[in-house]
């Protein structure tokens, strides 16, 4: 039975690979190189604004504006391409860009659709060189869906094992759910189990945890945001109330009683349906990603303390691990599975970016430094280095890179969250010591609030005095395209 499932899984991978080849041939015939950029990160990390800023930087790039792509100039070849052929929503770039440019800037609405893509067919021209055509695709995914990627490459049993390993590191948070499972043999109903798991998810939600799986309890399959706390009783842990699942102990698989076997069968079927409808379409796109940008919400981490800080790091490790070759399939299954895994990961560059840094204001704290040290630590860097064979860039966001000393001559880091996000006057600068953790190729600023409108979208003919935020965005844009415009 296991061999048959491996054959089916391997055949599915080959079919997806065949579709990849066909799309690649189409781009070759069009003589256009495609670059797919995917921005990942937990909920509210700034993915939509980041994508809008990046696209604006590309579309408004012209020689002499203080932004040099190795003397190449970018031009839109044939207007913004739509994505209707692949049944994926179009990223509303023009709407967001116009909203940012207003006298009273409008913040983009929360991303709710399953996925949206912005296609930029660009021509790059340089004196004395043949012009180059690039189709740049940028994928936007709701932050809620990122947690579902923990199901990728996992059967229901494998996912349960993974979830309970995570549970083991935070027993106090999920103790009631584990206690219910321990006592389930005495009085078990599926409804009671689902209610116990939803109660656990609600506790995680209130702690700003990114680990809300399945994500449909917060964002329905159709992209409608839910009132999770008020609608707990009616929210389904799956595609519908008839197709629900929750993690169960691995012991249930190894020596199950009759009621446990029936439960596992139903849960596994609901899990597979959910993966096919929600997770697999995202994974199919991610398999063809060339550039990966992972955003970390510094605002959420600093205001929430060490628990959220540790969760964010583990969340980043889990997501980035999906792209690492160290995590690929091995030839222990069907031969087709192994062959497809050899071409599965194509990411050449990965970037780790800290967002919302401008909301930190003056007051001595070492939280930011600790965060940077951890995010640039050996474990996470090891995952990033396993992603691709090209340049792996791990970068942190700062407003100003400088060294400041206290009266004793010791270096200090200033970081505190302003409780008033609507504050519009300039925040005090946050200074980070020059002795930045090794491994950061360069430092960049991606800012939030009013700073997005003032710094990320300046008048493109008046950029001589670009802000650190704009300079950072320029650096990232150049890095993303450096191998194509060498």
Q: What are the residue ranges of the model-derived segments?
A:
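N-terminal pre-Walker A segment at the start of P-loop NTPase domains
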Residues: 2-31
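Glycine-rich phosphate-binding P-loop
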Residues: 37-55
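Canonical P-loop GTPase G-domain recognition
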Residues: 52, 343, 357-429, 438, ...
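Extended hydrophobic secondary-structure segments that form protein cores and membrane-embedded regions
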Residues: 36-41, 136-139, 291-295, 349-356, ...
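Intrinsically disordered, low-complexity boundary segments flanking structured domains
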Residues: 37, 42, 105-108, 377-382
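Switch- and interface-adjacent substructures of P-loop NTPase systems
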Residues: 21-25, 31, 43, 58-346, ...
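Residue-level signal for functionally critical sites in structured catalytic/ligand-binding pockets
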Residues: 44, 143, 355-356, 369-371
